[in-house]
């Protein structure tokens, strides 16, 4: 778990997200409180539950990105789900319990990767020896012991050096590897994912541990053997135990579009896709135990971050019990021209930096001037104001249109420097922005 202080967390988020200081502050405190909780004794630790967060703001202002970056900083199991994908229990559709199952799957994958990385050097040594055993067969017994040892060691050293330098990558060898398990695709109705997963695991285990002899290039054999040897060094039970603990103590669930499951004020009668889903979500957020194929998972200390635009509803339209379980409410502000300008240049791997890097692979140098950046920001803001406001995502649409000709004719401009200035932006965008009907389809 991250031991970063709230100011450090906000500083790290600032590298990727512009503005929204209030939201960053709220998630930074929530993350730090997790670390604080882990420092307490067991009795008190169990009593302290996370303060879940509700982010309110239009699309494209950074709600999802804040949650995603937070999970990376915390090195925690993280999953993003759309509230609209779920239906009330008893109806056709995904049940909310699958959120925790998917989160546990993500944790298993995360812990497995961590374990493989930890054993990386050991695996490389084992694989190297297995390849050398094939390349340098053991000599016959009619050699004297001294001659055998000296000659074998010299030969091994020569082949080891060649192997490490990649000289033998294209050479083909025959190796014994575990037979691949039979691929069984099982179709199941929505909500039956758990049963499907168990049946697939059952069929995969039927193959046992049979070995096949395969003829492969050394570079391909190395990859295959690394997977095989890494799997041998991994303790599956330990991974399950560690993953379940990671989910229960550090898991983060981001529920997007929660406003879409609010019951409309003017509607009456049961609504499968709205209030019923909220009531099914409630036990997860309050704390319950969910059965997964890896074991039982308690949700008491999982952090839930919900978000929605709430354009046709308000947070008070959520059922009261769910409102109470999302005590921290943060409003994210619409993006201004200055925000767009900063988004284009300031974040790590900003959009303009990405385009520069892509064009550099073709030998084309792109230079965005300060005036050009300002014009792009103004164009994005104007289009958002006159049409649908999609926030920072509008910049991708605008830049893609700006770079269209450059990308298409990149091969003809090798070695050239192209300047994206005020004149260039005006030439390519002014007509589209002024003609609202045309812009609606293109931008």
From Swiss-Prot:
InterPro entries: AAA+_ATPase (IPR003593), ATP-dep_Clp_protease_ClpX (IPR050052), ATPase_AAA_core (IPR003959), Clp_ATPase_C (IPR019489), HslU (IPR004491), P-loop_NTPase (IPR027417). ATP binds at residues 18, 60-65, 256, 321, 393. One of its GO terms (molecular function) is ATP binding. It is found in: Cytoplasm. Keywords: ATP-binding, Chaperone, Cytoplasm, Nucleotide-binding. Pfam families: AAA (PF00004), AAA_2 (PF07724). One of its GO terms (cellular component) is HslUV protease complex. One of its GO terms (biological process) is proteolysis involved in protein catabolic process. Gene3D superfamilies: 1.10.8.60, DNA helicase RuvA subunit, C-terminal domain, P-loop containing nucleotide triphosphate hydrolases. NCBIfam families: hslU, PRK05201.1. A double ring-shaped homohexamer of HslV is capped on each side by a ring-shaped HslU homohexamer. The assembly of the HslU/HslV complex is dependent on binding of ATP. Belongs to the ClpX chaperone family. HslU subfamily. HAMAP family: HslU. ATPase subunit of a proteasome-like degradation complex; this subunit has chaperone activity. The binding of ATP and its subsequent hydrolysis by HslU are essential for unfolding of protein substrates subsequently hydrolyzed by HslV. HslU recognizes the N-terminal part of its protein substrates and unfolds these before they are guided to HslV for hydrolysis. This is ATP-dependent protease ATPase subunit HslU. It comes from Buchnera aphidicola subsp. Schizaphis graminum (strain Sg). The lineage of its organism: Bacteria, Pseudomonadati, Pseudomonadota, Gammaproteobacteria, Enterobacterales. The gene is hslU.
């Amino acid at each position: 778990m991250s031991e970063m202080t709230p100011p450090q967390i906000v500083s790290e988020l600032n590298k990727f997200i512009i503005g929204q200081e209030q939201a960053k502050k709220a998630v930074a405190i929530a993350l730090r409180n997790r670390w604080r909780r882990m420092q307490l004794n067991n009795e008190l630790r169990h009593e302290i539950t996370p303060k879940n967060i509700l982010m309110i703001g239009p699309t494209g202002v950074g709600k999802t990105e804040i949650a995603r970056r937070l999970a990376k900083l915390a090195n925690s199991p993280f999953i993003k789900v759309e509230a609209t994908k779920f239906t009330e229990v008893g109806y056709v559709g995904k049940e909310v319990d699958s959120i925790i199952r998917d989160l546990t799957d993500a944790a298993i994958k995360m812990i497995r990767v961590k374990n493989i990385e930890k054993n990386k050097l050991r695996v490389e040594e084992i694989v190297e020896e297995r390849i050398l055993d094939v390349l340098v067969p053991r000599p016959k017994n009619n050699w004297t012991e001294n001659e055998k040892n000296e000659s074998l060691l010299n030969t091994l050293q020569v082949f080891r050096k060649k192997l490490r330098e990649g000289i033998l990558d294209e050479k083909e060898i025959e190796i014994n590897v575990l037979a691949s398990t039979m691929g069984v695709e099982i179709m199941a109705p929505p909500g039956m994912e758990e049963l499907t997963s168990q049946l697939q695991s059952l069929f995969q285990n039927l193959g046992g541990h049979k070995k096949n002899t395969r003829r492969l290039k050394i570079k391909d054999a190395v990859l295959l053997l690394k997977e095989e040897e890494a799997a041998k060094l991994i303790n599956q039970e330990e991974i399950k135990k560690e993953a379940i603990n990671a989910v229960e103590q550090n898991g983060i669930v981001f529920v997007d579009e929660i406003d879409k499951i609010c019951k409309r004020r003017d509607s009456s009668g049961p609504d499968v896709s709205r209030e019923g889903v909220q009531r099914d979500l409630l036990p997860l957020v309050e704390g319950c135990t969910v059965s997964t194929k890896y074991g039982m998972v308690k949700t008491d200390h999982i952090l839930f971050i919900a978000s929605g635009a709430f354009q046709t509803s308000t947070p008070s339209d959520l059922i009261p019990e769910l409102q109470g379980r999302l005590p921290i409410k943060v409003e994210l502000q619409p993006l201004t021209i200055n925000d767009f300008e900063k988004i284009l240049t300031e974040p790590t791997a900003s959009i303009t930096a990405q385009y520069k890097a892509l064009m550099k692979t073709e030998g084309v140098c792109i230079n965005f001037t300060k005036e050009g950046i300002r014009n792009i920001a103004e164009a994005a803001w104007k289009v958002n104001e006159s049409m649908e406001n999609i926030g920072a995502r509008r910049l991708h649409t605008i830049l893609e249109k700006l770079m269209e000709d450059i990308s298409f004719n990149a091969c003809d401009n090798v070695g050239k420097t192209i300047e994206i200035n005020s004149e260039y932006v005006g030439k390519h965008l002014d007509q589209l922005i002024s003609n609202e009907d045309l812009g609606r389809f293109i931008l």
